[in-house]
Amino acid sequence: MQDLAKPKIKIKSPAKINLHLEVIGKREDGFHELAMIMQNIDLSDYLEFEINNEGLIKLESDCNDLSLSDDNLIVKSANLLRKNSNINYGANIFLRKNIPIGAGLAGGSSNAAATLIGLNKLWNLDLDHGTLCSLASTLGSDIPFFINGGIQLCFGRGEILEKLDSNFEYGVILLKNPNVSVSTAETYKKYSNRFCDNHLNDRKMIENIRKNLRDNGLNKLNFDNQHLFIKNDLQLVVENENDSVKQALYLLSKLENCLTFSMSGSGPTCFALFKDIETAKKELTANSKFFKDKGYDSWVCTFLEKGITFI
């Protein structure tokens, strides 16, 4: 095996929020048909990659709550890329974790996509964008979004992407109770039991919903007389069963300059939007102690035009 040079590659791996999450129905393959708008935000993890010639994937992290073994999406992504490319190189990977775990912000999916992108460069594989997206879709439904990044329409399981052209500069405040997490699989199951009686087979309805989101999705997110529309079907389930989510949404709704508020993904993180990052920072400065006293961690961030980036 030929030795490669040992550069160190560093990558910024951002979180996402859902600006629209519509569950159209349950498919015959067991997955749910979705129509979503996902947006990267600048709450980010950081990954470092370095070649090792032992043929091993070695993952370390500053987060003690993460498994670092083969069930970690970073390790799965690295092993998939090695197998697909038929190479024997390994990698030493270090993850600096800032995105909370089990929060509805898809930190694990972002890290998986960052690993595919980072190791593609580190190992000089030169795989094209389409190949990386195909590999990503085998690992998780929302991982292809992070290969693309920015703001995207997401259809199917979340793997069918259409780039949106926007220049939103909203500020974001996030709230999450650090002692609460939500199972995405359980949330979808509960939603399906309540609202999806039969398997979905109406292709015309699916296409109509997709067209409506293409035509009107961005309009609903434009600031107009302090009214924005954000839809999250899963919030119907989680808010009723999780007091911390219900309270977080209430607290965000009472912020003076809040334009709108919602839960992200399957929760439990909730967020509020503000006209710009300066307004969001002022609101968080004024309320951070109050949020902490209520049991919430809080963050302020803004939208990103791009997703995963080399640094």
From Swiss-Prot:
It catalyses: 4-CDP-2-C-methyl-D-erythritol + ATP = 4-CDP-2-C-methyl-D-erythritol 2-phosphate + ADP + H(+). The keyword Nucleotide-binding applies. Belongs to the GHMP kinase family. IspE subfamily. Its EC number is 2.7.1.148. The gene is ispE. InterPro entries: GHMP_kinase_C_dom (IPR013750), GHMP_kinase_C_sf (IPR036554), GHMP_kinase_N_dom (IPR006204), IspE (IPR004424), Ribosomal_Su5_D2-typ_SF (IPR020568), Ribsml_uS5_D2-typ_fold_subgr (IPR014721). Pathway: Isoprenoid biosynthesis; isopentenyl diphosphate biosynthesis via DXP pathway; isopentenyl diphosphate from 1-deoxy-D-xylulose 5-phosphate: step 3/6. It comes from Prochlorococcus marinus (strain MIT 9301). The keyword Protein biosynthesis does not apply. One of its GO terms (molecular function) is ATP binding. Catalyzes the phosphorylation of the position 2 hydroxy group of 4-diphosphocytidyl-2C-methyl-D-erythritol. One of its GO terms (biological process) is isopentenyl diphosphate biosynthetic process, methylerythritol 4-phosphate pathway. This is 4-diphosphocytidyl-2-C-methyl-D-erythritol kinase. Keywords: ATP-binding, Isoprene biosynthesis, Kinase, Nucleotide-binding, Transferase. It comes from the Bacteria. It is an enzyme of class 2 (transferase). The active site is at K16, D142. HAMAP family: IspE. ATP binds at P100, I101, G102, A103, G104, L105, A106, G107, G108, S109, S110.
